Amino acid sequence: MKDFKQYIEGNLGKSLKDCSKEEVYLALLQFTKEKSAALPQNNGKKKVYYISAEFLIGKLLSNNLINLGLYDEVKEELEAAGHSLAEIEEIELEPSLGNGGLGRLAACFLDSIATLGLTGDGVGLNYHYGLFEQKFKDNQQDAVPNVWLTPESWLVPTETSYKVPFGDFTLTSKMFDIDVLGYEQSTKNKLHLFDVESIDESLVSSDSIAFDKTQIAKNLTLFLYPDDSDEAGHLLRIYQQYFMVSNGAQLLIDEALAKGSNLHDLAEYATVQINDTHPSMVIPELIRLLGERGIEFDEAVEIVSAMTAYTNHTILAEALEKWPLDYLEKVVPHLVPIIKELDARVKAKYEDPSVAIIDEHGRVHMAHMDIHYGYSVNGVAALHTDILKESELKNFYEIYPEKFNNKTNGITFRRWLMHANPELAKLLDETIGTEWRKDASKLEALKAYRHDAIVREKLDKIKRGNKKRLSVYLQEKQGITVNENSIFDIQIKRMHEYKRQQMNALYVIHKYLDIKSGNIPARPITIIFGGKAAPAYVIAQDVIHLILSLSELIANDPEVSPHLQVVMVENYNVTAATHLIPACNISEQISLASKEASGTGNMKFMLNGALTLGTEDGANVEIHELVGDDNIYIFGEKSDEVIAHYEKGDYNASEFAQRDAIRPLVEFVKSDALLAVGNKERLERLYHELTTKDWFMTLLDLEDYIETKERMYRDFEDRDEWNAKVVTNIAMAGFFSSDRTIEDYNRDIWKLN
């Protein structure tokens, strides 16, 4: 095989050491694309089409080199010529195709589908500016377009194009592909990203994400989740969703026909995984397309119901999409009669209005359509699936118990261990052998080393090295200096009240006041946040403002700053995560119990040797079961208790706000000290929210949270015992490999050859 050095010499006519970083990057990108282009596609009879509004794939250069088995070789060649692969990788722009856990999960799943040699492609949209790039200005979030599309990217233009009909016009699509490589696999899959031929980037200025939301032919794929605080925003999201599923459905039918399907047997050639409710219109669209090709309505419904499966990712009512019928009449009038007929069939069979597709207010419940007309409904962690069956979707579970199943989420160890933490991967190879790279369950062999002083010392050294690396990264990106000898306590996830970043911020206030009164911690503490708030989500932006204001206040206080530091990472993304996660000591997983479907950050931290501070929520429950009581720090009320509070309506924030331990903390939010660096309107609004509404019960768990976190800080000082817990966590993380998750999906749902 021609190595990279020869490739450079042959293509650029000069030696590797004479090339600039940019030349090396562009050549390495092309070299890797050519290697992956040469691989044949997986081509089983049946294919899974994983349709998702988001694919948070991260930078691909190192990931693809690892999966091609070329990473070490290329790294050594570069080093020998005076280059650093890490520096070369810095030049790569991160694709802006997702935002949170939903998109990152989709990316991990594609990696695992390819690694297992299964035939499965992703289907999504080619967003030009993603969600947005986050900047901080005046201690507030500022959103600007996240530019990532350049001529030199992983996107490969294709000849595939479809006509997508809307109410008043038809748009022509253009399909771009990104190769999805499996780990040490000789085949590949694809991520298909659809764009509009008529897109117009000039609608957007460089310093704002505002744009004309009515010019659909020009704006359709500009942004992920465009602001939907008005009707134009709602309509644009429906246009986007239909454009995505119509292209996916047309592609799926074409590919099945090419393989010999007569369409009556389409379910033998294709299965569609609906990732959250955004792709739900694929059901009526497939029925429509089959009808156009001469298949009777009843049979079309039967075919589609045998080939669509739905993953529920949330129990938050606001996230289960319900579109007004009159909006659908405007955007996709040709689907409305189909949806009405599907609804009529449900209503003829079941009198219970709570299971109708169209409710009494004329809103179409997308999840209801998915459940009635799909063959599988899965939750993404054991607790989440139980809540779906016992409360949120109880009425559906009673009708279709056989459709419901759990598929606990997972993460790809290629990116989150081999790439993000190569020193730890090397230690694992030396200690337990390399089998874990292909079979994550083999990590459990590490348990035998819990009391091995040499292994614990090596783990400690690796953690210190990763803290140093993060410290350099934060200095380069934001000019922030952190104390590498401090405890790194990290909460990184999208900003949402149910994830309770505000509770962590109240802890910061507690610690600040504690230090001011003379209680100096045994070791300095660095509390790090990262995450974006949706532009229309005011309270989440207020929480960011509180965190940034506290950061400034503490940094300027010579009494407190040597002992406590607060950092908010700007524009948190996959790249930032690969620096933050390996450096972490304490993993904050503090959502209100019952609200987080699964979480995958908790798994990434566990795998990289952080200990979890968490509620009994989502996959924290399964982490707790795997590692045992002594190796995790659990606090707060349990999900059944929380659900009971909601049912009885007996949680009163204002009563909790008056408690002796809580009052000084919430009052500080609108104190003169904070107002000196903060915005009065934002801080007072947040104070009012916390002390009168507090819908996600921050104050309910706050005292237990503070006590548990303080205990964790004390335990950190017993380094041997702490590192023994770290060993157990890493050893038990194998269950959370996305390879295991995908094996489960395939065995129970997709049944690919």
Descriptions of predicted regions:
Residues 1-753:
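A conserved ligand/cofactor-binding region detector
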